[in-house]
């Protein structure tokens, strides 16, 4: 399947872009992002964009978007505006952000040695570290695995 950016968005439902990364505005849009691309990861940052740690990770993701474009499509979700997944993924009031990986409609579990393999919810300051994580997740998914261990 050839990937077309935002091809799954209907003409009258354009999403605003935050420096090139689409912001998903509804549970339906999140579902479509997870389902859409069968050859790349869907990396979704669920979070509260007004909080500092979320801003830091958003900046990191924005800076890597084009470097990782062949492996991943990235999306942002404001969990205060779109709360469809807050209970499912256990996002609480004290959560600033959580980055989650999806592959062909499957949630990918990543072991970060934090005890929570569902999501990456700590700040990564090193671009190469995040690139390495995405590469490991992507390669694991291409091999048919739905879980992997972080290289860091």
Question: Which functions belong to the PLM regions below?
Answer:
Residues 78-83, 108-115, 132-140:
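Low-complexity, flexible helical/coil segments
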Residues 14-15, 34-39, 53-56, 66-70, ...:
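Intrinsically disordered, low-complexity regulatory regions enriched in Ser/Pro/Gly/Thr
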Residues 1-42, 116-152:
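N-terminal leader/targeting and pre-domain segments
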Residues 71-74, 103-105, 127-130, 151-152:
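Short, surface-exposed, polar/charged, turn-prone segments marking secondary-structure boundaries
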Residues 23-26, 46-48, 52, 58, ...:
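Thiol-based oxidoreductase modules, predominantly thioredoxin-like and allied folds used
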Residues 31-35, 47, 55-58, 62-69, ...:
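Amphipathic alpha-helical interaction motifs in eukaryotic regulatory proteins
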Residues 61, 74, 84, 95-122:
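A short, hydrophobic beta-strand/beta-hairpin element that forms part of a small beta-sheet core
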């Amino acid at each position: 399947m050839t990937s077309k950016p935002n091809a799954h968005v209907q003409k009258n439902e354009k999403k605003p872009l935050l420096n090139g990364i689409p912001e998903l505005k509804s549970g339906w849009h999140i579902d479509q992002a997870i389902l859409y691309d069968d050859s790349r990861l869907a990396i979704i940052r669920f979070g509260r964009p007004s909080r500092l740690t979320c801003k830091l990770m958003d900046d990191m993701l924005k800076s890597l978007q084009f470097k990782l474009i062949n492996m991943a499509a990235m999306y942002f979700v404001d969990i205060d505006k779109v709360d469809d997944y807050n209970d499912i993924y256990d996002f609480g009031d004290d959560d600033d952000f959580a980055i989650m990986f999806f592959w062909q409609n499957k949630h990918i579990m990543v072991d970060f040695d934090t005890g929570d393999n569902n999501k990456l919810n700590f700040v990564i300051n090193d671009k190469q570290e995040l690139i390495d994580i995405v590469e490991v997740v992507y390669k694991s998914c291409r091999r048919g695995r739905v879980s992997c261990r972080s290289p860091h």
